[in-house]
Amino acid sequence: MRAVIPYKNENAKSRLSPILSKKDREEFVELMLKDVIKALDDAEVVNIDILTTSAEGIPNDFNGNVTITEPGLNDSINEYLQNANEPILIIMADLPLVTGDHIRKIISFSEDVVIVPGKGGGTNILFIRHPNEFTVKYHDCSFISHCEITDELDKSMHIFDSFLASTDIDEPHDIVELMLHGKGQAKEYAEKRFGSETGKGRVKISHLSKLSGFV
């Protein structure tokens, strides 16, 4: 099997712009990518590919394959799948809470397709045993789309339910989950820039502007 990580560094995570500058966001997404790669390494996934429109922000110590693609997430992944002849794990680069144990469990299921849903109807991870028969459809409500595609292909399916694996870091409030539950480099980065505020409601982040230099 192989793992593939779609990745964007340049001007990434614009929804975090209220709390992180462009430079900070680009550094942050690289650290999240490193955490995802570590989870794959911990699960003993040997073959790891990165799909990206630019090699900017790829960790210097990454030993896998980097494929430069044209813009367009679905087109890039579908072209990759059409050329694949072994099971493929598609994992997003903004999942710093995913662990090696999650990966091992996901690839251990016997079903043809394993789907890890994300927040708001997204798809965080897809494990596809017959990738050249499958077409991804990210954006909008991709979780429903991928369930429907699997059904149309008459393939068996397993939904992997995990809070940590379903938590992608897109919005400022997601940083709270990273600080509470993370263990990797992205968490360390966040803790240097944010504090937490507790009260009667949910935990909120507070910006440590003097530490981050954010304006």
Swiss-Prot record:
It catalyses: (2S)-2-phospholactate + GTP + H(+) = (2S)-lactyl-2-diphospho-5'-guanosine + diphosphate. PANTHER family: 2-PHOSPHO-L-LACTATE GUANYLYLTRANSFERASE. This is 2-phospho-L-lactate guanylyltransferase. Disulfide bonds: none annotated. Its EC number is 2.7.7.68. Pfam families: CofC. Homodimer. The keyword Signal does not apply. Keywords: GTP-binding, Nucleotide-binding, Nucleotidyltransferase, Transferase. Belongs to the CofC family. Pathway: Cofactor biosynthesis; coenzyme F420 biosynthesis. It is an enzyme of class 2 (transferase).
